[in-house]
Amino acid sequence: MELYNIKYAIDPTNKIVIEQVDNVDAFVHILEPGQEVFDETLSRYHQFPGVVSSIIFTQLVLNTIISVLSEDGSLLPLKLENTCFNFHVCNKRFVFGNLPAAIVNNETKQKLRIGSPIFAGEKLVSVVTTFHRVGENEWLLPVTGIQEASRLSGHIKVPNGVRVEKLRPNMSVYGTVQLPYDKIKRHALEQENKTPNALESCVLFYRDSEIRITYNRGDYEIMHLRMPGPLIQPNTIYYS
């Protein structure tokens, strides 16, 4: 099947697979939210949160109108008016970012497939990687790709993977722990003289409205990032 400059097929799991772009063979491998994979062949491709691809997916700004291929072959127009956070880990590389997102209802979601190409005008700009439920009849559809400068994205080498932990109410974060605000400063000061040879770790703390990422040596915090949520979560919730 063809649309604009792409050729695509539907695989046995009912997902859409992009086979060619501009008559050049394409590779698109979609990952579950938060998934960790070990496959050295994937390192040769571009990586954006939730996808490994031979295609460079274009930078998009909020309020862009996109079109998503539906199961009947028509294009559904959607507006990017929200943001969300997604990540994956590939060969110990933590790839993360705040992504623009569209809101879809249950009826629209049922018309879309994982892997469905996403267009801006007639240009392929991304693919559907996942959905995230935010209400009884409301889902976020994140659009992954290169991020504009006003949205945080990046990648970090994480020798020991990424631990994901839900932020409890009224807690602050330092390093690998969350504590009440009146205790966090003392805890931070206590880490100043800890051994420099401790294991490094990366921890992602989350609540509905906020994401925190820390990179640490033992309990000593080296880096601390804060950005908006929500965290896109997998269908099977395994986060604490």
UniProtKB/Swiss-Prot annotation:
Q: What does this protein do?
A: Nuclease that cleaves host 2',3'-cGAMP.
The catalytic activity of this protein is classed by the Enzyme Commission as 3.1.-.-
Gene that this polypeptide is encoded by:
p26
Q: What is known of its domains?
A: The substrate binding site is formed by the N-terminus of a monomer and the C-terminus of the opposite monomer.
Protein's name according to its UniProt entry:
Poxin
Q: Where is this site: Substrate binding?
A: 93, 146, 226
Keywords (A to Z) from UniProt:
Hydrolase, Nuclease
What this protein catalyses is: 2',3'-cGAMP + H2O = Gp(2'-5')Ap(3') + H(+)
* Metal-binding found in the keyword field: no
Family, per entry: Belongs to the poxin family.
What Gene Ontology terms describe what this protein does at the molecular function level? 2',3'-cyclic GMP-AMP binding; nuclease activity
Its quaternary organisation is:
Homodimer.
